[in-house]
């Protein structure tokens, strides 16, 4: 089993907080009920890009973990390869570990189930971990400088100017290693900047509402159609505004941000050298227990972009980044069918997800809330992040998961060159547009969207 963030292990001398361990407890309890079952936990693999390489290599070789965890967006990119068991029929069966349950699916929040649905209508992943994001800030630095958490982008820029003038790094923003912080930032900024254009991008002319499902407002097929029609284009000044705002912000990220990875960014923040850090609910327990922290911290929402900062701003609030993308996006390998153990693996997953087991498991980790109907006993520190997601997440994907993996890498390289002045906006967007169109063509071919081709030719 590959459990990702839930992977249990012992605390080592280098740990500054307790690692998760509760899955060991559940495994022992399960073995009492099923003595013949052997449960082996694979070591956790980080960062995300290294895990992606490892897991795809394992599946290609027919060695994917019997029970694994993987983001729904990645699973739904690769489900046609036959790596995963369709969980939909099993979700219709009773969960024997939940009293009175007649249908396993009924214990999960509707958004969790909807998030896991693949383009073919089946479910190859059960995404049950609710995660939220926020901007963590050093209350002591804010007090010394005399600033308050901002509500608008203009205020955000102004407090960073003052913090920088006081001799601190305003924002620990990593651009080495995992692309998460850039991805989250552009998801939020793009959603606000393109707010007035989303109905045209979707192709319906109707308002695009926010839900708890990431990027649900604009499907990948709708995005590809908009690219082919020139509606979603890197050469559109409204689209370009997200890059301009990101570059404006980058002046406050401190020297060497291109070589700063997420661990180094966290260390800048926790040691008091940087005033802010954009991260997920996963940092709450870590910051609370890290003995390097010698200050009070708080969390605020990503600031709203207004007309004061951009002519394209509609004043819509910033969306949340998160949803059902935390620990516990469960997958079952198709090889379990050949091994004759698929029913046992599903049974073990039913045991894990029973509320009396899942809530303590989540609290032990302290990073995410399970996507269950019954959340009695969940750590109250996670509630603000849950509420932020309930208010709605971003409606359209950014560079990282919107198109192809190749496009994400190409975009990121060009973005770095733009932020550091090696390319101007025109040069950067010319190149991005070329890569964007290539990715759109590849997705049309890969997914067999002949109807889209016919529509474009009409």
Describe every region a protein language model picked out.
Residues 66-69, 275-280:
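Paired acidic/hydrophobic, glycine-rich loop segments that form the ligand-binding mouth/hinge
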Residues 160-162, 198-259:
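Glycine-centered hinge/linker elements that transmit conformational signals in sensory
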């Amino acid at each position: 089993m590959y459990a990702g963030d839930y992977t249990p292990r012992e605390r080592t001398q280098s740990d500054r907080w307790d690692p998760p361990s509760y899955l060991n407890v559940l495994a022992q309890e399960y073995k009492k009920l099923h003595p013949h079952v052997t449960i082996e936990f694979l070591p956790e693999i980080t960062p995300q890009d290294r895990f992606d390489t490892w897991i795809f290599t394992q599946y290609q070789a027919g060695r994917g973990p019997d029970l694994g965890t993987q983001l729904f967006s990645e699973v739904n990119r690769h489900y046609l390869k036959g790596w995963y068991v369709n969980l939909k029929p099993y979700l219709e069966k009773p969960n024997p570990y939940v009293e009175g349950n007649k249908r396993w699916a009924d214990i999960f929040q509707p958004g969790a189930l909807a998030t896991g649905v693949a383009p073919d209508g089946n479910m190859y992943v059960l995404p049950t971990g609710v995660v939220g994001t926020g901007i963590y800030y050093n209350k002591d630095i804010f007090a010394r400088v005399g600033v308050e958490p901002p509500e608008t982008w203009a205020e955000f820029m102004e407090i960073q100017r003052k913090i920088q003038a006081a001799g601190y790094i305003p924002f620990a923003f990593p651009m080495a290693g995992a692309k998460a912080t850039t991805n989250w930032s552009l998801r939020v900024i793009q959603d606000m900047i393109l707010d007035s254009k989303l109905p045209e991008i979707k192709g319906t002319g109707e308002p695009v509402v926010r839900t708890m499902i990431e990027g649900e407002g604009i499907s990948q097929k709708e995005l590809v159609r908009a690219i082919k029609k020139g509606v979603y284009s890197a050469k559109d000044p409204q689209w370009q505004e997200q890059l301009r705002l990101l570059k404006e912000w980058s002046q406050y990220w401190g020297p060497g941000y291109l070589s700063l990875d997420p661990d180094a960014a966290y260390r800048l923040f926790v040691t008091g050298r940087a005033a802010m850090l954009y991260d997920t609910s996963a940092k709450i327990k870590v910051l609370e227990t890290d003995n390097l922290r010698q200050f009070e911290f708080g969390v605020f929402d990503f600031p709203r972009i207004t007309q004061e900062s951009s002519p394209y701003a509609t004043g819509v609030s910033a969306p949340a980044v998160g949803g059902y993308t935390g620990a516990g996006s469960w997958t079952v390998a198709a090889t379990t069918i050949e091994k004759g153990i698929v029913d046992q693996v599903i049974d073990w997953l039913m045991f894990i997800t029973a509320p009396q087991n899942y809530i303590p498991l989540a609290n032990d980790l302290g990073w995410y809330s399970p996507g269950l109907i019954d959340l009695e006993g969940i750590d109250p520190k996670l509630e603000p992040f849950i509420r932020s997601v309930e208010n709605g997440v971003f409606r359209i994907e950014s560079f990282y998961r919107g198109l192809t993996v190749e496009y994400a890498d190409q975009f990121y390289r060009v973005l770095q060159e733009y932020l550091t002045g090696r390319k101007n906006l025109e040069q950067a967007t010319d190149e991005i547009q070329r890569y964007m169109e290539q990715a759109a063509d590849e997705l049309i071919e890969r997914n067999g969207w002949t109807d889209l081709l016919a529509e474009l030719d009409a």
